[in-house]
Amino acid sequence: ANTALPTGANITQGSAQISQNNNSLNINQNSQNLSTNWNTFNIGKDATVNFNQPNQSAIAVNRVLDNNASQIMGKLNANGQVFLLNPNGVIFSKTAQVNVGGLVASTLNLSDNDIAQGKFTLKNNGNAGSVENYGAIIANGGVVALIAPTVKNHGTIQANNGVVHL
């Protein structure tokens, strides 16, 4: 759906207020690190997800429990770092507009235990999903990392004062 938004948020670490306003989902992150499990994490082409984070180094880890790849077709905005972890893959369509401090999109996992210890080491889970970008990903001052057994970039990735890892 053009207005699809992420569903079924369950915060497992940290604190945030999550609210929906028409075609926008706002995640107001209170803690430096936030970890959320989502039933689905899709953004329709007319939809927007905003992460309002305490600062540029704040991290929001989003684990997707869906059996399908996440389809990012709309806008994903954040002033800090966003991890989008879906073992079945993450697809940024040609209409995707990602504007964040930093982005890690991966089929690998990251445990709450490691996050609590300040370790952001992605662990392989044996899934063969792919991460594909056909859209525009812009990171201001951070890293853009697309990590999966298969990674395809047909779009644009821009890291202003940052680094791109494919």
List PLM regions with ranges.
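Solvent-exposed adhesion/ligand-recognition segments of exported proteins
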Residues: 1-166
